[in-house]
Amino acid sequence: MRHQLLLLWLLLFISGVADAQVTICGRVVASSDSTPVIGATVKVVGVEKSPAVTNIDGQFSIDVPDMQAEVEAAFVGFPKKRMKVQQDMLIVLDDGSVVVPLRKRLRIELTEGEDSILHAVNEFSFRLLRAVNKQKTTVLSPLSIACLLGMTNNGAAGQTQDEVCQLLGCQPEAANAFYKKLIPYLTGDGEGSCFSMANALFVNPKWKLKEDFRSQAVENYRACISNDLNVKSVNDWCASQTRGMIPQMVDEIDPNTLLTALNAVYFESQWSDVFDAGGTRPIDFTLANGTKVKLPLMHQKHLFSYGEGDGYSMLAMPYTDGCSMVVLLPDEDSSLDRLLSSISYDDVDKVWKKSTTCRVDVLFPRFEAEVEQPLIPVMQQLGVRSMFDARRADYSRLAYVERGVPVYVSEMKQKARIEVSETGTKAAAVTEQSFLVGAARPPQYRNCTFHATRPFLYMIKDNITGSILFIGTYYGE
């Protein structure tokens, strides 16, 4: 009898603890115009648990231990906001200006398997750039594409899933664990990041996502899920996640679209050593066809990491947040096309690891580029084919549809934009997939020259993981 009473008391105590949890709802908006901040994280201060993520309307719900708790809202480019909880909370983030990040970053340690996945994604970056090269300035985020494919591959099976696994270099379970670890690091759940990544699933209310696919997207990719599948909602989400750099992703949505899956990435950071705007002047730039044109080239002499590979030189210009722009400049007797035809990520990584600090005389163009890149022919060229074929695509784990009704990827594209100036860089990309789915003696530094006065390849790279966030070419046109 005593044991039964003790057990009953324990059950009542546990029930009381569970009941003590309070679910708080609220919205996160920007201070300037009260627009919803989509994809902001809201976490309970002092509690180790995954944060809530705001939806398309900036709304969130989160369990707190009691009404004395505090929550903290964060979104890239905004100062964090901490508030005591209350029902129907309104959290206003100050969007007056992008804060200069601290030099402190979250720590991350990748396992051997995770390093292998990252290597595959970085190698994919170069294969992708080769596939789209048309001797035109371009900008891409291969990481955005890889993350989106990793998320939606949880809804695939058979050959459709296998082809994506081959491209990404891992099985779905490994991809899920990798991005669950990488996204919080890159998007700055701590101080010091000016990079954000967000995922969204806009679902046609006529169909219902399968629970396993839905939960994998939310838990591993922090996906925002909405049944409001329309042009305005999709474009509003894209504009919000890219701070207006990609304001319009879709023009129309087919009524038979089951799902539009999106990944958005945004980067904004200052150079560690800014260029003097007064030093920017028109200088001859040699186009791919040999023609010379006057372009605004920025100039500075400073200490940078510099290396030389087979037929090219490499320069790494650091940002304040732990990332760098890495530029590969073909030798004068070579060309960017020749470099692209043979170079691999392993080649670049070897030169990167052997690079030394030099005093470099830099000439580099101030430029902007905006590209819309259709991805279906590119993916097919890279071996991913069945997802685009209604007769062969297998998305049986994606949603509940009538037996025999095909679900396939009817559209896949990426829009990307980059702005490079004397003070720093802004870059954004949205990928869409629609389913119809060192104090010793002062060191002596070598003097080097890096005059980017001809076409070159560039990357924005995280210095800790080596992850390529953006990659592109500049031809000067």
Region locations from a protein language model:
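Short strand-edge motifs at loop-to-beta-strand transitions and within beta-strands
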Residues: 60-62, 89
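Short, acidic Ser/Thr/Gly-rich low-complexity loop/linker segments typical of extracellular
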Residues: 48-59
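Short, ordered, surface-exposed loop/turn motifs in non-cytosolic proteins
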Residues: 22-24, 31-45, 66-68
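Non-catalytic, conformational "gating/processing" segments within enzyme and secreted inhibitor domains
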Residues: 135-136, 145, 178-333, 353-442
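Extracellular beta-sheet/turn segments enriched in Thr/Pro/Gly and aliphatic residues
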Residues: 85-104
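A short, solvent-exposed loop/turn motif at the edges and junctions
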Residues: 44-47, 72-84
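Detector for small/aliphatic-rich hydrophobic stretches
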Residues: 98-228
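Beta-strand-rich domain onsets/edges
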Residues: 14-23
